[in-house]
């Protein structure tokens, strides 16, 4: 099924590129065009010497995939603030502030999940359990239930995997933090940087059920389990209530080429071709110059966007941002 969806999303990208009269992606012309529109956000360059195949590969969320059961509505009884930032609400949970880097791999579906899961384990243990959950374990061991690894996957499958098989700890590339740190290096977005070049190539690493040398406990004993996984309705208030009560969530949306140029403000699509689906972590909301927004963490390193974060228009299901919200709860007995 996912092969069909992946093919369809590729076709979408191709047809939209053919029919587009827009400026070349990542071009100065596109930056200038967006900034002349006087919209709610500012454009600039985040990627300099990268191949477009790499950028398309980053968009590895297969939209409209399998759905998790929807949780019961509870927002009606809640008084929600005008703005909310999980980083400030739970300051003793450092993963909420963290931005990771998925490298040359379409693993955003895994990153959005493990980032929000890490946050929630800390939040629901009242700060007692601080763990970077392993994107490597999710990416390499989930298998076909999650899609196709670096070639794209389903956020819903990721949360389901957490409840069924659990996830070990694992930090950033070369961090030697946790049982299974990420094995794909960050690649170079800039002209004269020191990281390897960004390409659209890259196979999914193998599933290894062994922790890296010197780490204990064992792989089996390092697993953190979810006790539930669910989707949240596309109702704006329900999504806000979920984040307010339980912590950051994973979402996914359609990326157009103008989004790649985001620097600050509240993103809304202005111009450019559809690149694919992208999964992210939503950690709050607010209003900027009368424009309501979601506060979102990306997985394209801290030199992208606003130190790795961005804001996107809230309340209008813009680019589908409110249609694919998934989350879950950690098992209390682990704490």
UniProtKB/Swiss-Prot annotation:
Its EC number is 3.4.22.1. It is found in: Lysosome; Melanosome; Secreted, Extracellular space; Apical cell membrane. It is a peripheral membrane protein. GO terms for molecular function: collagen binding; cysteine-type endopeptidase activity; endopeptidase activity; proteoglycan binding. Glycans are attached at residue 192. Pfam families: Peptidase_C1, Propeptide_C1. It is an enzyme of class 3 (hydrolase). The modification N6-acetyllysine is found at residue 220. Residues 1-19 form the signal peptide. SUPFAM superfamilies: Cysteine proteinases. CDD domains: Peptidase_C1A_CathepsinB (cd02620). Keywords: Acetylation, Cell membrane, Disulfide bond, Glycoprotein, Hydrolase, Lysosome, Membrane, Protease, Secreted, Signal, Thiol protease, Zymogen. GO terms for cellular component: apical plasma membrane; external side of plasma membrane; extracellular space; lysosome; melanosome; peptidase inhibitor complex; perinuclear region of cytoplasm. GO terms for biological process: cellular response to thyroid hormone stimulus; collagen catabolic process; decidualization; epithelial cell differentiation; proteolysis involved in protein catabolic process; symbiont entry into host cell; thyroid hormone generation. The active site is at residues 108, 278, 298. Dimer of a heavy chain and a light chain cross-linked by a disulfide bond. Interacts with SRPX2. Directly interacts with SHKBP1. Belongs to the peptidase C1 family. PANTHER family: CYSTEINE PROTEASE FAMILY C1-RELATED. This is Cathepsin B. The gene is CTSB.
């Amino acid at each position: 099924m996912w092969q069909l969806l992946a093919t369809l999303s590729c076709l979408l990208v191709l047809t939209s590129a053919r029919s587009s009269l827009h400026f070349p992606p990542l071009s100065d012309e596109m930056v200038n065009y967006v900034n002349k529109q006087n919209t709610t956000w500012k454009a600039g360059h985040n990627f300099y010497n990268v191949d477009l195949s790499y950028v398309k590969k980053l968009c590895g969320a297969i939209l409209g995939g399998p759905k998790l059961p929807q949780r019961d509505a509870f927002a009606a009884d809640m008084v929600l603030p005008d703005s909310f930032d999980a980083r400030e609400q739970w300051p003793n949970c450092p993963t909420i502030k963290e931005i990771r880097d998925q490298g040359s791999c379409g693993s955003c579906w895994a990153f959005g999940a493990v980032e929000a899961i890490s946050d929630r384990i800390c939040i629901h243990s009242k700060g007692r359990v601080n763990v970077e959950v392993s994107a490597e374990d999710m990416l390499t061991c989930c298998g076909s239930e999650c899609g196709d690894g670096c070639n794209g996957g389903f956020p819903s499958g990721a949360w389901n995997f957490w409840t069924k098989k659990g996830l070990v700890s694992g930090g950033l590339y070369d961090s030697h933090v946790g049982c299974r740190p990420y094995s794909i290096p960050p690649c170079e977005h800039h002209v004269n940087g020191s990281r390897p070049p960004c390409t659209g190539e890259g196979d999914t690493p193998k599933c290894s059920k062994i922790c890296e040398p010197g780490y204990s406990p064992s792989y089996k004993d390092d697993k953190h389990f979810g006790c539930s996984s669910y989707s949240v309705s596309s109702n704006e208030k329900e999504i806000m209530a979920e984040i307010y009560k339980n912590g950051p969530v994973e979402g996914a949306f359609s990326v157009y080429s103008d989004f790649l140029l985001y620097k600050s403000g509240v993103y809304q699509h202005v111009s450019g071709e559809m690149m694919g689906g992208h999964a992210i972590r939503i950690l709050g909301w607010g209003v900027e110059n009368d424009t309501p927004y979601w506060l979102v963490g990306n997985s394209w390193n801290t030199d992208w966007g606003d130190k790795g974060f961005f804001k996107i228009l809230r309340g209008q299901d813009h680019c589908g941002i409110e249609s694919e919200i998934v989350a879950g709860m950690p098992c209390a007995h682990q704490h």
